[in-house]
């Protein structure tokens, strides 16, 4: 049985008190945490931590830990960590961008490993003040970023040999998937609009520098709204001008989200090429946007959903 560290608790209580005083003035944010709290390196920590009991923040990070066969160290995970199914049995410490320190402290972790962009900054500050080793894993939305992420998690866990074996397997799979996407001629590439949400009829879409933009490009398509960074609401005029051939969304399951008929009934979308062919693709969010070990599978699935069949070069 692991005893709770009461010396750590006292440090945490002081830090949490400061956090509680600041929270009334916090606003939820879609943006990543401040760069002062996230190292550009793929793994940043103050010292080599004890990783016998870890909380994993970020679906791809958790997935990598399982792929490395080191899941026995996990004592908690965030709400985006939905794969593999076994991860759902772990205590859920909340959404990666809206973490509450007390939920993480409650599972008594020896260390925390989190994907870049986790937050809010005030919560991360509380966790660091509680003297819990905190490691950030960097994020880029390309093949190199996926492989670096695996190596960084392997280094954090102290299993670099396992990480290199996984890198080799994932790299081969990615190279095959990317070769198929690259074989498609530029003139044949379809324009894809990723829609994050349609709240109150407002289309929140992906521009550049996002996981959505990255996976669209890796699948051999064009980001139809690639003229701005991050996510933002689009005007009706901007949607019509984007001329998407395909609409891409996360599959939220059940009755959540609009049906294809409801979506394409929205005035701006009704005027797009995608509406004429009812071209709507929904995929599991972590699989599509996680940029973890299964990304090659996501590339193939999205490529097939967009184009219907493989290119001649891959047949």
Residue spans for each PLM region:
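A ligand-binding cleft/hinge motif common to bilobed small-molecule-binding domains
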Residues: 118-129, 246-264
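Short secondary-structure boundary segments
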Residues: 58, 116-117, 139, 228-231, ...
